[in-house]
């Protein structure tokens, strides 16, 4: 933000200043990731067959086939893990809405609210601060009121944010909506992952988290595609498009209702017990 604000006095054009922020972002990523690569020990041991497969094209196709079969196996088992299935649907729905906020909030701010580039960068900066506060604060709230209830509250905050953004005709209202988005963004993602950990059998945690991530990646496509389709059909009616985005969050609230954490935890524990029994028999 300082580069964008002060870069003009250094003779930099706006394009050069924005490009410079990308370099700063890359540096921040490198610094943040360095401790992981330097100090975090890898406990999992890769399968020798998988390492060998990476050295040839046929081996890569074999690994891809195995991965696809494992995804199909996870899908078939969702009938038993119905609480995880409902949670995955909930995550897909609310992440579709979040993907719109992340990728298209700058477009909405510029087209509807008349934000300049500097205004938009300031918006992103402050929203990230409120996202950090939301993730930290709601972490304590989750421990006090429960993960499902905390996630439900954040989804309602998302719905309120959409209503404010769609109705905003002045900047203070839009800024309020943006900061609500920041508070809900960090907390909804952390609450979702916490519930996945509860509903996942320990012996299949990587499989379940992979399926959860796949649902979120699919949402990153569906959400912006839905927003873009509405603006294209309605000749750039961004307010209607953001209202449609709100339907994702409203549907996520409904998908969260059937999730029963105690039942899901019990099924996960039974699966682990059965897995240990099978292992001991061998």
Please report, for each region that a protein language model flagged, where it lies by residue:
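A membrane-interface helix-boundary motif in multi-pass transporters
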Residues: 2-27, 229-249
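Multi-pass alpha-helical transporter architecture, strongest
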Residues: 28-39, 243-275, 281
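Juxtamembrane intracellular "pre-TM" segments in multi-pass secondary transporters
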Residues: 42-87, 281-282
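Short amphipathic helix-loop junctions that connect adjacent transmembrane helices
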Residues: 103-120
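Helix-to-loop junctions at the C-terminal end of transmembrane segments
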Residues: 133-147, 231
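Structural signature of the two symmetry-related core transmembrane helices
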Residues: 149-164
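Helix-loop junctions at membrane interfaces in 12-TM secondary transporters
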Residues: 166-178
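Intracellular juxtamembrane helix-capping segments at the cytosolic ends
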Residues: 187-201
């Amino acid at each position: 933000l300082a580069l964008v604000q002060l870069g003009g006095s250094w003779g930099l054009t706006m394009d050069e200043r924005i490009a410079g922020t990308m370099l700063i972002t890359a540096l921040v990523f490198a610094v943040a990731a360095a401790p992981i690569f330097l100090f975090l020990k890898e406990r999992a041991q890769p399968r020798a067959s998988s390492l060998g497969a990476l050295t040839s094209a046929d081996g890569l196709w074999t690994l891809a086939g195995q991965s696809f079969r494992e995804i199909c196996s996870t899908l078939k088992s969702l009938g038993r893990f119905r609480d995880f299935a409902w949670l995955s649907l909930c995550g897909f729905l609310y992440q579709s809405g979040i993907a719109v906020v992340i990728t298209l909030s700058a477009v909405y701010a510029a087209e509807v609210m008349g934000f300049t580039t500097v205004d938009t960068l300031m918006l992103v900066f402050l929203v990230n601060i409120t996202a950090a506060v939301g993730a930290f604060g709601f972490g304590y709230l989750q421990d006090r009121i429960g993960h499902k209830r905390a996630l439900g509250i954040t989804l309602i905050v998302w719905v309120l944010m959409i209503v404010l953004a769609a109705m905003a005709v002045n900047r203070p209202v839009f800024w309020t909506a943006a900061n609500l988005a920041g508070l809900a963004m960090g907390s909804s993602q952390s609450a979702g992952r916490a519930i996945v950990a509860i509903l996942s059998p320990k012996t299949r945690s990587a499989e379940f988290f992979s399926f959860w991530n796949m649902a979120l990646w699919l949402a990153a496509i569906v959400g912006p595609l839905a927003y873009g389709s509405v603006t294209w059909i309605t000749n750039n009616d961004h307010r209607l498009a953001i209202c449609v985005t709100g339907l994702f969050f409203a549907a996520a609230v409904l998908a969260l209702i059937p999730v029963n954490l105690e039942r899901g935890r019990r099924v996960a524990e039974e699966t682990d017990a059965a897995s240990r029994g099978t292992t001991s028999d061998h």
